[in-house]
């Protein structure tokens, strides 16, 4: 085994061998889903043909959870070279709606006008409401950034995520933002904008408003609400998120985000619930719980869930 001193003296950054190791692990269907997610979370920090090709291949994986996360990663990376393959994913109605939705969101995150025709086509023709709503968001995001001339520096989230909507304009009160978020007649983009403004506020009243949105009609909005609550890691949301995870009639994309959010909050009740629903018959839910529990185990043991690039593949478990 390589010593810590030797590893520490290595040049920081992935070697070609490390990159190949991560790509192979991501695409190895014989590996546990949590290990494949470790590779995915590591590859999203890289750029170039190898990581892009592996993530695009993973976007058509038999695991819908992994496939949608791969598409999400490409959007967060804002890799324009991935656009043709992401467009092909969006058009492929044989793929799960959660994967098509994430491809549409990724196109919006990359934000190039050449994606507009397909997003408009899918908005009109895709049979899944959650995909239609995502296309609406992506189109509005591209349009708003173009018209406002928004620079990248002004759109970076304090949570380091590329969000599907820009936060609502400053000056609105938490009460006003709550009303917009909970208004079923309001456009999806404006509700998302209110959501991200409330997240950035993050005070108790803002968190309460976000939690209330878990009762919305739109599965797409509810899944983003759960995602945001995971970013905030506020224990005040635990009971509401637990209720969502337990509801087998809820859309899998919402339950999956609730599971991941509970993993971020990580109190004892949340962990027990994740262990219970790691046996859920819906793979999107059970695999989410499995990944969340694995991440918590690494955190407890003081190890990194992501692979450390200054190490060789053979010593990753010793990080």
Swiss-Prot record:
Names of required cofactors: Fe(2+)
Enzyme Commission numbers on file: 1.14.99.29
Protein name: Deoxyhypusine hydroxylase-A
Keyword Repeat: yes
A single MF term (Gene Ontology): deoxyhypusine monooxygenase activity
Chain segments annotated as coiled-coil in the UniProt record: none
Positions of Fe cation 2 binding: 223-224, 256-257
General function of this protein: Catalyzes the hydroxylation of the N(6)-(4-aminobutyl)-L-lysine intermediate to form hypusine, an essential post-translational modification only found in mature eIF-5A factor.
Cofactor detail note: Binds 2 Fe(2+) ions per subunit.
GO biological process: peptidyl-lysine modification to peptidyl-hypusine
Pfam families, per database record: HEAT_2
Catalytic activity, as annotated: [eIF5A protein]-deoxyhypusine + AH2 + O2 = [eIF5A protein]-hypusine + A + H2O
Ranges occupied by HEAT-like PBS-type repeats: 66-92, 99-125, 188-217, 221-247, 254-280
Family named by the database record: Belongs to the deoxyhypusine hydroxylase family.
Alphabetized InterPro entries for the sequence: ARM-like (IPR011989), ARM-type_fold (IPR016024), Deoxyhypusine_hydroxylase (IPR027517), PBS_lyase_HEAT (IPR004155)
Residues engaged in binding Fe cation 1: 68-69, 101-102
Entry keyword Oxidoreductase: yes
EC category: oxidoreductase
Keyword field: Hypusine biosynthesis, Iron, Metal-binding, Monooxygenase, Oxidoreductase, Repeat
Pathways involved: Protein modification; eIF5A hypusination
């Amino acid at each position: 085994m390589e010593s810590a001193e030797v590893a520490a003296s290595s040049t920081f950054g992935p070697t070609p061998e490390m990159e190949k190791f991560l790509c192979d692990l991501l695409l190895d269907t014989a590996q546990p889903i949590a290990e494949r997610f470790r590779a995915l979370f590591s590859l999203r920090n890289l750029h170039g043909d190898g990581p892009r090709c592996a993530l695009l291949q993973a976007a058509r994986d038999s695991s819908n959870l992994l496939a949608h996360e791969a598409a999400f990663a490409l959007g967060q990376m804002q890799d324009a070279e991935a656009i043709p393959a992401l467009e092909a994913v969006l058009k492929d109605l044989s793929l799960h709606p959660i994967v098509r939705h994430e491809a549409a969101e990724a196109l919006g995150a990359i934000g190039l006008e050449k994606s507009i025709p397909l997003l408009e086509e899918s908005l009109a023709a895709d049979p899944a409401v959650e995909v239609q709503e995502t296309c609406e968001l992506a189109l509005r995001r591209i349009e708003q950034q173009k018209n406002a001339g928004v620079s990248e520096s002004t759109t970076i989230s304090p949570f380091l995520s590329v969000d599907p909507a820009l936060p609502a304009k400053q000056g609105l009160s938490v009460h006003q933002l709550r009303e917009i978020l909970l208004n079923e007649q309001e456009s999806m983009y404006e509700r998302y904008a209110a959501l991200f403004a409330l997240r950035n506020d993050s005070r108790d009243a803002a968190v309460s408003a976000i939690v209330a949105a878990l009762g919305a009609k739109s599965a797409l909005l509810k899944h983003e609400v759960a995602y945001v609550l995971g970013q905030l890691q506020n224990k005040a949301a635990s009971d509401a998120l637990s209720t969502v995870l337990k509801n087998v009639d809820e859309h899998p994309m919402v339950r999956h985000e609730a599971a991941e959010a509970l993993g971020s909050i990580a109190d004892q009740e949340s962990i027990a619930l994740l262990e219970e629903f790691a046996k859920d018959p819906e793979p999107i839910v059970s695999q989410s719980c499995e990944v969340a529990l694995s991440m918590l185990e690494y955190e407890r043991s003081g190890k990194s869930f992501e692979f450390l690039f200054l190490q060789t593949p053979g010593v990753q478990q010793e990080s």
